[in-house]
Amino acid sequence: LSGAPLSFWAGVAGKNPMRYRGGWTGGVWMASLFSDLGNGMFDGANLMAGFEDLNLSRTLWDKQYFLWAHIDTEEERYLEFEKWWNGFFKLTGEEIHFIIDELFIGNRLEKGRVGMNGRNIDLKNVEGPVFVFASQGDNITPPQQALNWIPTVWKTVDDIRRQKRVIIYMVHESIGHLGIFVSGPVSRKEHREMISSIDQADLLAPGLYEMIIAEGSQNNVHDVRFEARDMDDIRALDDDVDDSFSFAAVAALSATNDAFYRLFVRPFIRPVINEALAQGIRQLHPLRTSKYGFSDLNPWMLPFKALAAHARSNRRAADDTNRFMALEKQVSAQIGHTLDFVKEVRDLGQELWFQSVFHNPWLHYWFKEKPSDAGSDQNTCREEWMEEIERGGFAEGVVRIMSALAHAGGSTDRSELKAFREISHKDERLVQLVSARLAEAVNKQACILAGAPERAIAALATLLPEPADRRAALAIARSIFADDDLLAPDVKERLQAIERALDISL
């Protein structure tokens, strides 16, 4: 889940104004109106306009100024990006209505109230490791919207463990929403390491982890580890302001406005809209007219085409010491700062308006949040597994040892998981646990260790009664956790406890 919101109401006051827009626009009725004006299709240019409106200085000034200030090198990149960025898509009216009403305004997904194919979607039922990638610099999907569903759905990390789920998240410090998907450095680092970690993630004990990427000792190689986290680590990213009832009031207002529109306004709009008129309305969208208005489609631009060729052939770049260039940069910076100030005032005004209208005790009384419906208890950590604490053989003993050591210090290095998977493919007694059975074995042994860690370690002597098996199991552990100087104190202590339980050391 890269830059994907699942907690649509979450955010920090004074920092994430986009979440308030559903309130001051009246809700989903505008999507219904735009879909009707599009003859049943919603124009994606409306979504892009909302995105560009978030950063006035970049949209109205900085992007264009940077192009002209670097006209000798930026032309090709600028045109390539603009062609991609302005390739607007269309959604059916039903699609956009579902997305806005059920998700962005209703926030029903994390509550388990989104119905599909006759049943509600419960995020607890997502099997396999879940990777979440968020960024502090993302003003479209802030970390709170990407991560707050975890404590909402699971309540505690123990709930995650009981249902044998692995959730891994990573928070970038600065990259923006678009950069999460198209940035080259992010693709070469975060995306590559997440993809490389998929095969090792199912060897982690069930729980919540933060993925940490550190620069490695070799070029283009990173050291990846998984730090155990608690729900408080996710809540720490938020501002502890409970404004859920305000958004519940917005959802109620949205439903009322949409019902009014569909009943009293739609019957007068749909009969007069046909495909030709809808196409004309789409072409008149400001994001389109601002592009083809300065293209060859506009006959008034023909003289500029000839002038452009003349200017290109007689181009003389000004020196950096040119006083007019220095003045130009100062004026440009001042324009950008002014637009940023206008944006801040606008966002603050919208937030204050939202809070004054929707965040008051009267609405709190009428629009109390209902408890989440999510939270089935199926696939919980099986109680009978605890009864198997002394059952098993060499394979179970090795998996228990590896799980105990890998998670002893609260941090698990990806290289350790990768090394154990490679060993499990080579050892004839472990090869039977490859793939799905290996993940199940890790879940079982992690459950046993979490429930009774001291008993689980002591029972290793029963699982490995033969001295040769004990030496072989410890040799596997030592091949992965080899350097005593680099081992965390908790890992050393756990390894010594295992050696004492087996009455053997290497």
Regions found by a protein language model. Give the residues of each.
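Short secondary-structure boundary/capping segments
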Residues: 13-25, 146-153, 184-189
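Short beta-strand/loop motif that positions the catalytic acidic residue
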Residues: 126, 132-134, 138
